[in-house]
């Protein structure tokens, strides 16, 4: 919804981003929409005081909605498996039956016909976490038939029941079984058991590529991640049936204790309670920017109980110290790793300036250049540009984007490398990056000397030739 309600996309455009792919991690909240999906979407918007009539149901109408608002940057969509599954079968923790699986296949085909360029899964998040590999394989076959990208927030990035390396292998197996192009989203190794082992993820991708599989990844260049409260603090079984069912479980003292015991394990993955910072919590903005130790002192209880009390009042999100520098650097060096923010297009004023979101929305690309190219020099300038421009376009099969070439759309940045600077921080995230002298979108100048100029020149991309 960010790109519709704030088509200026300031946090991205000012740092030189001219294209955004929506719907990652299985979360295409805006399509397809059932009555229940619309209610859930409005609940999310209510937290920011946004009330919008949702008079669309499918991708065609949703993308037209964005077009009518004239975005500042180019936009393309993915159909998210989590949204698709809830559209067809709700939040039930079970396998899809044949009729439900066929309906999901049909919806993917409809979405492809209406202009989506990707199919995404969030296999860590409910309800995607309730699906089997076989379900994803069957759906990925439809993606492959239409030559769209399959991107996946894999089933685990740490040491829970699935496990990091089996989850990584599952994504590669989907490529092997279907032929689909696989993009492993925000590649990372989380938790004490996996810190220092990021290189093994790269070895896995390289082995798959040597086998002839089209597998790659993307990364945001930070040591902290960001996830909704329910997504990072509670076991998957406790989320079955959606928020209302979860709240009912929390009222049962025995179940509550069971959830809290598992929450302890989650907290320990993030360098403890001090590594869990509440980023977005409209219910009580005074708590935003505080870590779980500080919140627990205010609430006079444990970090685990504090998390549950927060969620009982409202969903929110945490920034989490989930990674180590060595792993982030190792992954950043890999040539088949795109740079991708995993963050929304935001603004430093208005409803989208609320909370203390992850600074990646304002600084991913600037940080990659400043830290890995100019700073520790682990990535060459030429390779950094490739991994932010032509390689992402290639992954999406975009035929006229990502390069300065004859008959290509002119999406161009002009800058001096030593002037690129990220200003957003975890404490003060709503700050624009600096250093872009000129940003050109579809041949039209959109930024001069770091300042936006009048007009919005982005397009909704619905085909590989747009």
At which residue positions do the language-model features occur?
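Small-aliphatic-rich amphipathic alpha-helix that forms the alpha element of a beta-alpha
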Residues: 5-24, 107, 384
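Divalent metal-coordination and catalytic microenvironments
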Residues: 16, 75, 115, 153, ...
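C-terminal cap of metal-dependent C-N hydrolases
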Residues: 245-246, 252, 330-336, 341-342, ...
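Acidic, glycine-enriched loop/beta-strand segments at the rims
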Residues: 318-328, 376-385, 393-430
């Amino acid at each position: 919804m960010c790109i519709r309600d704030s088509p200026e996309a300031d946090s991205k455009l000012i740092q030189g981003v001219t294209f955004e792919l929506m719907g990652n991690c299985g979360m295409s909240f805006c399509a397809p929409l059932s009555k229940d999906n619309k209610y859930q979407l409005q609940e999310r918007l209510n937290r920011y005081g946004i009330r919008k009539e949702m008079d669309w149901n499918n991708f065609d109408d949703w993308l037209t909605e964005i077009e009518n608002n004239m975005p500042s940057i180019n936009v393309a969509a993915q159909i998210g498996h989590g949204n698709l599954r809830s559209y067809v079968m709700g939040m039930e923790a079970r396998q899809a039956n044949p009729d439900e699986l066929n309906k999901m296949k049909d919806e993917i085909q409809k979405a492809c016909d209406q202009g989506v360029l990707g199919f995404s899964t969030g296999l860590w998040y409910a309800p995607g976490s309730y699906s089997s590999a076989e379900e994803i394989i069957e759906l990925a076959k439809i993606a492959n038939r239409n030559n769209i990208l399959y991107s996946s927030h894999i089933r685990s990035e740490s040491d829970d029941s699935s496990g990091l390396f089996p989850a990584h292998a599952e994504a590669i197996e989907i490529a092997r079984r279907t032929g689909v192009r696989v993009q492993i989203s925000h590649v990372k190794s989380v938790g004490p058991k996996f810190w220092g082992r990021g290189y093994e993820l790269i070895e896995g991708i390289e082995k798959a590529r040597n086998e002839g599989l089209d597998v790659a990844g993307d990364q945001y260049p930070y040591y902290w991640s960001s996830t909704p409260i329910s997504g990072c603090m509670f076991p998957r079984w406790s989320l079955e049936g959606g928020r209302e069912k979860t709240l009912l479980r929390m009222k049962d003292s025995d179940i509550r204790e069971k959830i809290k015991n598992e929450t302890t394990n989650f907290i320990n993955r993030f360098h403890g309670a001090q590594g869990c910072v509440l980023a977005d919590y409209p219910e009580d903005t005074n708590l935003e920017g505080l870590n779980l130790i500080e919140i627990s002192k205010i609430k006079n209880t444990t970090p685990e109980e504090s998390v549950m009390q927060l969620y009982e009042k409202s969903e929110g999100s945490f920034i989490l110290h989930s990674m180590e520098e060595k792993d982030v650097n190792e992954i950043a060096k890999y040539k088949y790793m795109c740079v991708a923010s995993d963050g929304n297009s935001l603004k430093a004023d208005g409803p989208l300036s609320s909370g203390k979101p992850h600074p990646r929305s304002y600084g991913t690309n600037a940080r990659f250049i400043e830290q890995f190219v100019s700073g520790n020099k682990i990535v060459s300038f030429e390779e950094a540009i490739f991994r932010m421009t032509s390689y992402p376009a290639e992954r999406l099969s975009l035929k006229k984007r990502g390069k300065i070439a004859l008959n290509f759309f002119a999406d161009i940045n002009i800058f001096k490398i030593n002037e690129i600077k990220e200003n957003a921080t975890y404490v003060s995230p709503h700050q624009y990056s600096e250093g872009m002298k000129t940003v050109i979108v579809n041949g039209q100048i959109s930024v001069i000397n770091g300042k936006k100029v009048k007009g919005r020149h982005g397009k909704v991309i619905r085909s590989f030739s747009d």
